[in-house]
């Protein structure tokens, strides 16, 4: 790769030229089963005809005008997202970090309007919300923050899935205005929240007048088998953030607001040059259409359950395996030791995965994954894991 590139990525030694469905081909025409989907972004896989057509047609007509003007594609996508989520309004951006940054700003402005000039937000340990300074401060990872201090203040981190800890944090700090959490922690090791915990947090936020802000950047847009992972708990947040799969690979982010969070921002309180442009929103509309027309929510749920069960069965009783967990097509396999080398070994075997939290194999395949392709993942990955663990004894 070019020496002119900033040295911030530990890249695997492969370059891809094209893709089709769940498959990618490298410069040597070798084929790989993509079980990572660009870290959960390529939800329709590669070369999806509907998405390609929508992007091509929109690019030929108009790519960018800015938010100085009306953007019909933006308005249409906002309506679709509001219908699917039950939320009231949508603010578009370009990434998950930007969407979460907007949510943090909204929570602070919400507090400010109530006379709270130093609003605090409760966040979870092992969480991940982005790489801007505010989202890093919200993220539950000291390693990610190292060297970038001083961090913005106003964040209180508590253990995940611990409702009493959230309640205690609110009692200790009267300036709390919001709780920010992931329903299913992605970078945190595919850690699911308890449904009772989510319902309890919803009730607590309502009682205290706090905003419940849910980060669905990785778990949203059908990945768990529902449009948004919090829908499994039958709750609605006040703020929700989206990105990754929303436009199938075209950069986009979104912050949705409802209830007390709706109408907090006014003209001039936030903004973006590129966010919600015609191209990205046309892609987002195509993604939603494809998920609906091709039954991909049901597919993610059913094929994900099949893959989960197959992995759990094949790895049951294997020394060194802690747990197979997740929901839909957002799955993790936790080992009892660092296993980053498995990403390289899987790539060498024709399978694309990654490892998070040093010892959790993460699977985020496209929502179009078939049962047969799920079985191929199992056939490649399970022997690699068993071999790795046997060598480490």
UniProtKB/Swiss-Prot annotation:
The modification N6-(pyridoxal phosphate)lysine is found at residue 244. Pathway: Amino-acid biosynthesis; L-arginine biosynthesis; N(2)-acetyl-L-ornithine from L-glutamate: step 4/4. Its main location: cytoplasm. InterPro entries: AcOrn/SuccOrn_fam, Aminotrans_3, Aminotrans_3_PPA_site, Class-III_PLP-dep_AT, PyrdxlP-dep_Trfase, PyrdxlP-dep_Trfase_major, PyrdxlP-dep_Trfase_small. Its EC number is 2.6.1.11. Disulfide bonds: none annotated. It is found in: Cytoplasm. May also have succinyldiaminopimelate aminotransferase activity, thus carrying out the corresponding step in lysine biosynthesis. This is Acetylornithine aminotransferase 1.
């Amino acid at each position: 790769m070019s020496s002119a590139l900033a040295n911030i990525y530990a890249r695997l030694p492969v370059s891809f030229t094209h893709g089709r469905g769940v498959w990618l081909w490298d410069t040597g025409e070798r084929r790989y089963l993509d079980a990572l989907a660009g870290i959960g972004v390529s939800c329709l896989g590669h070369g999806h005809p509907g998405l390609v057509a929508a992007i091509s047609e929109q690019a030929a007509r108009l790519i960018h005008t800015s938010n100085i003007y009306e953007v019909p594609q933006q308005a249409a996508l906002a309506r679709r997202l509001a219908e699917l989520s039950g939320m009231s309004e949508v603010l578009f951006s370009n990434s998950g970090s930007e969407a979460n940054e907007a949510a943090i700003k909204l929570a602070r402005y919400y507090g400010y309007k109530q006379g709270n000039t130093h609003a605090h937000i409760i966040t979870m340990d092992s969480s991940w919300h982005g790489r801007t300074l505010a989202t890093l401060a919200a993220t539950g990872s000291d390693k990610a923050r190292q060297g970038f201090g001083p961090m913005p203040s106003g964040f209180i981190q508590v253990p995940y899935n611990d409702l009493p800890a959230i309640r205690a944090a609110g009692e200790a700090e009267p300036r709390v205005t919001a709780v920010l959490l992931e329903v299913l922690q992605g970078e945190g090791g595919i850690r699911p929240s308890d449904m009772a915990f989510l319902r309890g947090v919803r009730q607590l936020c309502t009682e205290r007048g706090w905003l419940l802000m849910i980060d669905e950047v990785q778990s949203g847009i059908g990945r768990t088998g529902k449009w948004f992972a919090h829908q499994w708990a039958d709750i609605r947040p006040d703020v929700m953030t989206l990105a990754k799969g929303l436009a199938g690979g075209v950069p986009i982010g979104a912050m949705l607001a409802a209830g007390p969070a709706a109408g907090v921002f006014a003209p001039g309180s936030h903004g973006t040059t590129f966010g919600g442009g015609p191209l990205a929103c046309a892609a987002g509309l195509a993604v939603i259409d494809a998920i609906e027309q091709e039954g991909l929510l049901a597919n993610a749920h059913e094929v994900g359950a099949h893959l989960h069960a197959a992995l759990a069965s094949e790895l049951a009783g294997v020394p060194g395996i802690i747990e197979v967990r997740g929901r839909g097509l957002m799955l993790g396999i936790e080992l009892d030791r660092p296993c980053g080398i498995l990403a390289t070994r899987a790539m060498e075997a024709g399978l694309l995965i990654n490892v998070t939290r040093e010892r959790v194999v993460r699977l985020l395949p496209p929502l179009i994954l078939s049962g047969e392709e799920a079985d191929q993942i199992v056939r490649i990955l399970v022997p690699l894991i068993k071999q790795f663990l046997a060598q480490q004894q």
